[in-house]
Amino acid sequence: GSEMCIRDRIKDPKSRVLQIQGPASIDIMKLASSGKIDENMPYFTSNFFDLGGQTLYVSRTGFTNELGFEIFCDGFKTDHLALWDYLIECGKPYGMQFSASRAMTIRRIEGGIFGNLTDIDTTITPFEAGLGYFVNMDKDFIGKDALIKKDKRTCLFGITCKTAVPKAGSKIKINDKQVGYITAGVPSPTLQQGIGYVRFYEPNDYINKEIEIILPDNSSHTGVVVDLPFYDKEKKILNAEGNIAVKN
């Protein structure tokens, strides 16, 4: 057989992204695009649109598990300040507010979205990450033989804690034995408690089990293992069929 080597050079396109996320995002983008973007734009689709006199690439995607859009600039061709001012003005009637990446991180964890190289990496299989439904074992693909031999059970779950916010790197113990660690954790305004992801060393039946969380300060807290996502398992929010019910 012959060998083939493919080399590709990936360049930074100098493109940066703004996200408009939340239940009013369709109305805001409809206004910003003069009606060209509306509720008929399917999820995970994209196209070029005129936003305030500038042509920009817009996708109906996001990193929040919310109804929303991402707007990609065209490098130095984009007048970023003008775009920012235009979008802020379009969002005013709908109460849109600026939020930093921390807010996005909270929402992506609440929504059960994994971060590459933080929650998942090349040392975990799709099955261990709970993403086995994306793998079609009836087809041939690179790595299939290795996956056939692997355990198909999940090692990555959600965790809730009423007395503390789980911190990345925190140890997870069951019966005084370390069985895993926290990959990411945040305070959840939706669930009114600390939440995060726990990665176990071995697959097992962990759902609804109480575990011990050892934070970096060595304090001990009780947590409960839960299935992901933490809420909206039917994805009604993404399909504009519902909104978050924040607990008071």
Predicted regions and their residues:
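Conserved, structured C-terminal
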Residues: 2-3, 7-248
